[in-house]
Amino acid sequence: MTDRKIRQISALLIEVYNGIMQVEDKYLRTTQFRDITVKEVHTIDAITMYDHKTTTAVARQLRLSPGTVTASIDKLVRKGYVVRLQSKDDQRVIRLGLTRRGRLIYRAHQSFHRQMTESFLNGMDLEQVDIIEHSLLNLQTFLQIADEKGDSNEND
């Protein structure tokens, strides 16, 4: 692969990432969820409607420190999107759940991503979709390795 092609794809990745963030932000500003940021929506997405995760589990998924996620969750609790639930199994463990409002934004965000993905894959055959999936898995692996290296550099 040529250096020019790599630069071109790199620029496209940056442009697409920034575009997704801008569109998500614009969408939020036109809904009843004007009081929430895109980062907070991604925290809600990590909490999910289906599991009652701990703050540590959410932090791990978002690749953020537990302290950073705790601050975000505190805001989401104040805004009425998230509740803290005491574990039935272990009273010391606090789990996270979504309020009705949190579930609404969760579903809206899931719908947005589904529409975006369907649009992205529109007109592709299964072989092309498999290539896209393989490429995204390569990117995900790179990000995981880079994240782990960053963690080990912080400990030096």
Kindly give the residue locations of the regions a language model identified.
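Residues within helix-turn-helix
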Residues: 55-56, 67, 74, 94
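N-terminal leader segment of winged-helix/HTH proteins
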Residues: 1-35
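Alpha-helical linker/hinge and terminal dimerization helices associated
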Residues: 13-16, 20-27, 62, 105, ...
